[in-house]
């Protein structure tokens, strides 16, 4: 039974039983805690937790899933896959254990004619959680399983969760007995190669908390209602129904192995696993990883150096290296992507329609990694040789670090290659060096930001507690000075006079207990404003030029003292420049709107990679492969400005992190968030993000948004830049004035400028071609004329001339070679000299050519060029047959030509 038929029968079975068919979600979700969708129930989590009401009581789906913790085991065993399809049925407070067992048993054992898989009931086993007597009894009642074919297991095996806080519950697994050729009797607890798990029924009834293992986590309590979540691995059941030994031989994976076999000099030979294990593993790695890579790229992931993109990069690199170890030296990734997309295109049509993009991204990574392998492999071989020669079996951490830092070798690749050489790697030493490098980078960044301040000077204030930020509610705040710092040293008082003192750089910082001034973070630059004294200190004033956070909690105000003095403990007034804040809020809110527009136009996989917001300007970086089309840029700008025009209300509120994510709030992948987060909402579902920045009250306050351009800033990362508000208007006004000027100069209406310029460009190109033809004709004519005027100096035919009119050095070089060819086989020398222009900026290009017969006489073109150079204050070089140079003194041209003649006369 082909896989597409297996999928169809599964969905049909549950649709007939009243379930709603739900399409597979992307393997990427807006959840920073979840690298990839790793289970069929992930898209239904809010329903299980009771956070929202499902639109159906029961559902069925076949979900794309990716699991990468066991990536190093892929291929070594035949049970691990990084990508798989999870067929599932779900009940949200409808049926529970009885219904789940009845439906699963019917599909597995019903005949082909009745829409089932026709499995022999005598070969099916079940496992249940240790104390789940109810499930054990139902298996006996419904399926007629004898007690000896119902085995009990603990939390590690039969209590399911996603591995992170969320729904959980006891499970019951269904196993298929493949027969004695696969191992001894005794059921799943004895041998899971013989007894293959095909279906897992999870009785979702509790909510779990944090934990580090499958058994070590808190059960928070019951869910609002009892639910069912089941998962049947499509590849697993295909293995059984297609009668093959492992998943790599089913109809979805075997075509990839067959392709590789046509390119590799060594075969895939699972019948001789003991003697051919290493090559078989490489075949299986390529087959598995090719599918996963195609799915990831199809769902919008690009190969980069962190997060999901790094997983993709690692998969592609393992494919490429495995192919090389099989003896495949030519590019293969493009063919692999074509084979995978063809095999899986029926289930996932996007792999076919989006093939060009998928292929382009994968092949680009292959090209780049081949360069990495070429440059780093020699060093690795040297490292292995030195390690073995020293009698050690451990590659030094420093060597692994050098491979990573200099040649881009990921540590996983070094570990893999070392293992193949019978060595291990000092991973602890490697990670210590990586940590030191990261710490150096942080220190460098902090030093650049803090102008090399000793950050420990702030420790007492940091320990005292965070600065209270009042800037969301007010722009003016009365505060107390907690600390004053000059040149990184804490002082009790600072006065305006320090500006004039020798050796003082006027770097003054104030730390207050409260402030309305926003500290740079989240891509938004710091507020500008003032800090002033009150009462007796009213004459004291400082302009705030920057605000930075120390230890993420302490606001440090960098100021320029303008008058008076500040004393620790004084009360002051901190004021935000309202125009600056307004502009910064426009930029930050504009960034949210542009982000939402990007996701609407490009899809949810246009994931934020960074941003910068300042008054009137925004910059947004996002993961995307390839440049945007003109149409996409126009759409993004249009959607953005439509949102501005819609005058959406901007709401901010705090919420529990889990609740905010369940609402659909976008969080940055890899970012650490507290339990309570601030959510910024614009237009309801249009834009919902976790954000701690300042914003406008409604989107109309952003003003027009003009996208300036889009560019690449690294592999798989694009950047959009835009003006907002008044700056956007000014930019548009400038462009309008420019267009009006062009229209006036071209004497056409503005709307015809583009066509008119295109016509002029074509005319210019045609004229340039005509000029080039004329120039070449003139050069040919000059060559013919010069050859006709050749003179004899002794036995040598010579053309030694000053060319009339300016002539380019390249033309001069062509001329001497062409003339030399016209002078026949007798000894011949051609020396031409010219002047590029009149006046003090003139240069004197020259070129000399000597044919083989002249060289036999000892005449060398490069020697003659050296003689020319000395006379016209120049330099040059070349070979015996052709040389050229350039001088600065046109007055020496005649003398230079005489010098050439004299040199030839001495030989000829």
From Swiss-Prot:
It is found in: Cytoplasm. Zn(2+) binds at residues 588, 592, 691, 695. GO terms for cellular component: cytosol. It is an enzyme of class 6 (ligase). The keyword DNA-binding does not apply. One of its GO terms (molecular function) is alanine-tRNA ligase activity. Its main location: cytoplasm. Its cofactor is Zn(2+). It catalyses: tRNA(Ala) + L-alanine + ATP = L-alanyl-tRNA(Ala) + AMP + diphosphate. GO terms for biological process: alanyl-tRNA aminoacylation. Keywords: Aminoacyl-tRNA synthetase, ATP-binding, Cytoplasm, Ligase, Metal-binding, Nucleotide-binding, Protein biosynthesis, RNA-binding, tRNA-binding, Zinc. Its EC number is 6.1.1.7. It comes from the Bacteria. Binds 1 zinc ion per subunit. Belongs to the class-II aminoacyl-tRNA synthetase family. NCBIfam families: alaS. Catalyzes the attachment of alanine to tRNA(Ala) in a two-step reaction: alanine is first activated by ATP to form Ala-AMP and then transferred to the acceptor end of tRNA(Ala). Also edits incorrectly charged Ser-tRNA(Ala) and Gly-tRNA(Ala) via its editing domain. Consists of three domains; the N-terminal catalytic domain, the editing domain and the C-terminal C-Ala domain. The editing domain removes incorrectly charged amino acids, while the C-Ala domain, along with tRNA(Ala), serves as a bridge to cooperatively bring together the editing and aminoacylation centers thus stimulating deacylation of misacylated tRNAs. HAMAP family: Ala_tRNA_synth_B (MF_00036_B). This is Alanine--tRNA ligase. The gene is alaS.
């Amino acid at each position: 039974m082909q896989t597409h038929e297996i999928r169809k029968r599964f969905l049909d079975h549950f649709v007939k039983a009243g379930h709603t068919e739900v399409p597979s979600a992307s393997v990427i979700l807006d959840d920073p805690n979840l690298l990839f969708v790793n289970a069929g129930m992930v898209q239904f989590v809010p329903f299980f937790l009771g956070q929202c009401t499902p639109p159906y009581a029961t559902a069925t789906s076949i979900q794309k899933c990716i699991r990468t913790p066991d990536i190093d085991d892929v291929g070594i065993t035949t049970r691990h896959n990084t990508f798989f399809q999870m067929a599932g049925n779900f009940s949200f407070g409808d049926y529970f254990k009885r219904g789940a067992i009845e439906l699963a048993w019917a599909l597995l054992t019903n005949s082909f004619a009745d829409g089932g898989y026709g499995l022999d009931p005598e070969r099916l086993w079940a496992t249940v959680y240790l104390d789940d007597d109810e499930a054990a009894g139902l298996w006996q009642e419904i399926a007629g399983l004898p007690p000896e074919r119902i085995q009990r297991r603990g939390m590690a095996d039969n209590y399911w969760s996603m591995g992170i806080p969320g729904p959980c519950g006891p499970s019951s697994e269904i196993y298929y007995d493949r027969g004695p050729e696969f191992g001894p009797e005794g059921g799943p607890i004895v041998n899971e190669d013989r007894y293959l798990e095909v279906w897992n029924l999870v009785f979702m009834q509790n909510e779990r908390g944090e934990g580090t293992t499958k058994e070590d986590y808190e059960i928070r309590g019951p869910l609002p209602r009892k639910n069912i979540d089941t998962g049947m691995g499509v590849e697993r059941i295909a293995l059984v129904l297609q009668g093959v030994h492992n998943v790599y031989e089913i109809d979805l994976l075997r075509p990839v192995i067959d392709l590789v076999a046509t390119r590799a000099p060594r075969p895939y030979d699972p019948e001789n696993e003991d003697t051919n294990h290493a090559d078989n593993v490489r075949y299986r790695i390529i087959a598995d990883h090719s599918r996963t890579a195609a799915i990831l790229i199809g769902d919008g992931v690009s190969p980069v150096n962190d997060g999901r993109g790094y997983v993709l990069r690692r998969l592609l690199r393992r494919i490429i290296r495995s192919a090389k170890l099989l003896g495949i030296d030519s590019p293969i990734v493009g063919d692999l992507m074509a084979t995978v997309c063809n095999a899986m295109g029926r289930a996932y049509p996007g792999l076919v329609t989006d093939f060009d993009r998928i292929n382009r991204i994968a092949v680009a990574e292959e090209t780049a990694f081949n360069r990495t392998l070429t440059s780093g492999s020699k060093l690795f071989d040297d490292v292995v040789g030195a390690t073995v020669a020293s009698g050690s079996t451990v590659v030094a951490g420093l060597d692994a670090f050098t491979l990573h830092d200099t040649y881009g070798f990921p540590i996983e690749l070094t570990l893999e290659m070392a293992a193949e050489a019978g060595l291990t790697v000092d991973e602890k030493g490697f990670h210590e060096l990586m940590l030191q490098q990261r710490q150096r980078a942080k220190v460098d960044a902090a030093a650049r930001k803090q102008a090399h301040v000793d950050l420990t000077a702030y420790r007492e204030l940091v320990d005292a507690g965070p600065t209270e930020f009042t800037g969301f509610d007010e722009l003016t705040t009365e505060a107390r000075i907690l600390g004053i710092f000059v040149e990184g040293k804490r002082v009790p008082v600072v006065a305006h006079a320090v500006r004039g003192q020798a050796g003082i750089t006027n770097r003054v910082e104030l730390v207050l207990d409260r402030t309305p001034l926003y500290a740079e973070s989240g891509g938004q630059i710091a507020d500008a404003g003032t800090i002033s004294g009150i009462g007796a200190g009213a004459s004291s004033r400082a302009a705030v030029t920057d605000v930075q956070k120390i230890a993420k909690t302490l606001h440090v105000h960098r100021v320029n003292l303008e008058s008076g003095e500040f004393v620790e403990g004084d009360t002051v007034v901190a004021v935000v420049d309202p125009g600056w804040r307004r502009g910064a809020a426009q930029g930050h809110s504009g960034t949210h709107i542009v982000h939402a527009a990007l996701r609407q136009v490009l899809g949810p996989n246009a994931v934020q990679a960074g941003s910068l917001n300042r008054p009137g300007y925004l910059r947004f970086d996002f993961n995307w492969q390839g440049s945007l089309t003109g149409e996409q840029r126009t759409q993004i700008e249009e959607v953005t400005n439509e949102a501005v025009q819609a005058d959406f209300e901007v709401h901010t509120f705090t919420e529990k992190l889990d609740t905010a994510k369940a609402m659909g709030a976008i969080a940055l992948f890899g970012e650490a968030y507290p339990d309570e987060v601030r959510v910024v909402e614009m237009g309801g579902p249009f834009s919902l993000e976790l954000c701690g920045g300042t914003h406008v009250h409604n989107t109309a306050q952003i003003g027009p948004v003009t996208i300036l351009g889009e560019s690449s800033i690294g592999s798989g990362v694009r950047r959009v830049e835009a003006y907002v508000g008044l700056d956007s208007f000014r930019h548009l006004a400038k462009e309008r004035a420019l267009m009006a000027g062009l229209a006036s100069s071209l004497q056409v209406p503005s709307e015809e400028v583009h066509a008119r310029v295109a016509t002029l460009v074509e005319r210019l190109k045609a004229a340039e071609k005509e000029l080039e033809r004329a120039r070449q004709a003139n050069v040919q004519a000059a060559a013919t004329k010069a050859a006709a005027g050749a003179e004899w100096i002794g036995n040598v035919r010579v053309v030694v001339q000053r060319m009339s009119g300016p002539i380019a050095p390249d033309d001069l070089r062509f001329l001497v070679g062409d003339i030399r060819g016209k002078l026949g086989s007798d000894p011949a020398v051609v020396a031409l000299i010219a002047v590029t222009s009149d006046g003090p900026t003139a240069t004197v290009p020259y070129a000399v050519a000597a044919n083989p017969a002249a060289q036999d006489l000892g005449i060398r073109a490069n020697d003659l060029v050296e003689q020319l150079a000395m006379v016209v204050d120049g330099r040059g070089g070349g070979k015996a047959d052709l040389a050229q140079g350039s001088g600065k003194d046109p007055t020496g041209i005649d003398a230079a030509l005489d010098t050439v003649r004299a040199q030839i006369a001495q030989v000829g």
